[in-house]
UniProtKB/Swiss-Prot annotation:
Keyword Mitochondrion: no
Pathway named in the protein's UniProt entry: Protein biosynthesis; polypeptide chain elongation
Residues passing through the membrane, by range: none
GO BP annotation list: peptide biosynthetic process
Subcellular location: Cytoplasm
One Gene Ontology term, aspect cellular component: cytoplasm
Protein name: Elongation factor P
Reported function: Involved in peptide bond synthesis. Stimulates efficient translation and peptide-bond synthesis on native or reconstituted 70S ribosomes in vitro. Probably functions indirectly by altering the affinity of the ribosome for aminoacyl-tRNA, thus increasing their reactivity as acceptors for peptidyl transferase.
């Protein structure tokens, strides 16, 4: 059991008999009374996000998970296929189980497969990934003076804002937690 005041983004808990990933957790105190812990939880199986308020001091069970290194192989329809690096077993995860991580997956990339009771329930991405720009506006001389950026589409379909000097075909690093441009690869 973990106290709700200790919940942090990325943790997995069991709530209403389902496994949830904590997307946000913040503490709110009201006058003299005890505080509230406001959380945003994402159901690992269904992908639904719900907001739950816990009274300060409550405890929730932490989900017992295991992580195994795996390699992303390919996508076939609505399923993404991974191979564990220790025993070379293949696992398929649905698009709902992958969630927004699909925008960062490139074939042969290494990820952590998340298991609960021997069943894969999701993946953990590395902090940054290298992706290729496939579509962006051309840059013009003097664009860098104004700062800001321009929209770009990456090889996985992810749309982000990049600096003006980035061109089509450039490899860039993207933060998987925020979806923002980090730098050139």
């Amino acid at each position: 059991m973990i106290e709700v005041g200790d919940l942090k983004k990325g943790m997995f808990i069991i709530y209403d008999g389902e496994i949830y990933r904590v997307l946000e957790a913040s503490k709110h105190f009201m006058g003299r009374g005890s505080g509230l812990i406001r959380t945003k939880l994402k159901n690992v199986k269904t992908g639904l996000v719900r907001e739950v308020n816990f009274p300060s001091g409550d405890k929730v069970p932490e989900a017992e998970l295991s992580f195994r290194k795996a390699q992303y192989l390919y996508r076939d329809g609505d399923h993404y296929y991974f191979m564990t690096l220790d025993d070379y077993e293949q696992y398929a995860l649905s698009e709902e189980e992958i969630g927004d991580a699909k925008y960062y997956l490139v074939e042969n990339m290494e990820v952590d497969l998340v298991f609960h009771e021997g069943t894969p329930i999701g993946i953990e991405l590395p902090t940054t990934v290298e992706l290729t720009v496939v579509e962006t506006e051309p840059s013009f001389k003097g664009d860098t003076v104004s700062g800001g950026g321009k929209p770009a589409v990456l090889e996985t379909g992810l749309k982000i804002t990049v600096p003006y000097f980035i061109e089509v075909g450039d490899k860039i690093k993207v933060d998987t937690r925020t979806g923002e441009y980090v730098g050139r690869a």
